[in-house]
């Protein structure tokens, strides 16, 4: 499948600092954030005009699920649009707090762990054909995903009883299973719960919940693009060396703690391989695969950055990727800060900087400052992100949903939508079932819109 439907779900961390005596719980802060949403959507679980879903997840975490996308740069634009949507809610909620005499600053973090050690996720979704062997996908994908943090982790300072150490991934410490149907209780790497949000006879949805939330657009593109390419190769019958891991959960932590990528992890049957070895194998296959594939500049960009990142890790010389890979950007930031102020990695100021990197409010978040200074590379533009805030992808089913929502709101009509259903809540209860996520034109939807 060279044209694939993809999407990213991001849970955001919420906190609030108060100027006055009154303090609010995270639940109350989340309710302030969603008050505007509830006022027009009558719920804290809504679909937006751009085809995305916005809702309040378990544990007061706002979650934004992008609309269905079929290209990487389109997906990065819609992922960034989620930050803008949440930032608008934040500004609105702060204004309401001020009006009610509760002075406070609300912070939304696009990260994966809070100070209390709780974890929340960034989930990638890939449409796969029902016909393939799902177990083969899992077997080949698992070693790739366990070691992928080497090229696209968000980076984190981990405080241990002995000392503070810099790790590649925020999520690695919180993953407890390889493949499972649960998402919160056990946190697997690949979630197998079968909800395709499409024609179930034709498709499955691969739900990857091991990735970090990325701030750098190039890292997001590499994270999703490399996984999509490995999937494509599995579907094309490319054979891979057997890197079955002895213990994926131990391996994911060991890889996260080793920025050299060279420490061996145990494979099944007593063999060993390093994260670098494993990633090199997948990358080499990708380079080979591109020779026989239709040219695609976005995919070529992914494979190029993938290779350069592995070269940088191997040489421990990061100058060639220190504007493109989140954990490298963050580590460089910490090192400069430590050199300037003589801080140890365990200093609370470093933990503060770690958090501020993920603050999505423009003008305040550290990543935004770096971006404005041209210290991080981009693949989008402000205008294309603004467009993604307002409009759905024009090439997928999201266009049908977005057009329907826009028309129903303009006509003042009551409606209900989810990923596959569009329903007008009138006497006739007319409903259109959209089972093909690749289809952006549908006469039934056009008729439903025309009837409003």
Swiss-Prot record:
Belongs to the Pup ligase/Pup deamidase family. Pup-conjugating enzyme subfamily. The reaction mechanism probably proceeds via the activation of Pup by phosphorylation of its C-terminal glutamate, which is then subject to nucleophilic attack by the substrate lysine, resulting in an isopeptide bond and the release of phosphate as a good leaving group. One of its GO terms (biological process) is protein pupylation. It is an enzyme of class 6 (ligase). Mg(2+) binds at residues 9, 55, 63. The active site is at 57 (proton acceptor). PANTHER family: PUP DEAMIDASE/DEPUPYLASE, PUP--PROTEIN LIGASE. InterPro entries: Pup_ligase, Pup_ligase/deamidase. The lineage of its organism: Bacteria, Bacillati, Actinomycetota, Actinomycetes, Mycobacteriales. Pathway: Protein degradation; proteasomal Pup-dependent pathway; Protein modification; protein pupylation. Its EC number is 6.3.1.19. This is Pup--protein ligase. Catalyzes the covalent attachment of the prokaryotic ubiquitin-like protein modifier Pup to the proteasomal substrate proteins, thereby targeting them for proteasomal degradation. This tagging system is termed pupylation. The ligation reaction involves the side-chain carboxylate of the C-terminal glutamate of Pup and the side-chain amino group of a substrate lysine. GO terms for molecular function: ATP binding; ligase activity, forming carbon-nitrogen bonds; magnesium ion binding; ubiquitin-like protein transferase activity. Keywords: ATP-binding, Ligase, Magnesium, Metal-binding, Nucleotide-binding, Ubl conjugation pathway.
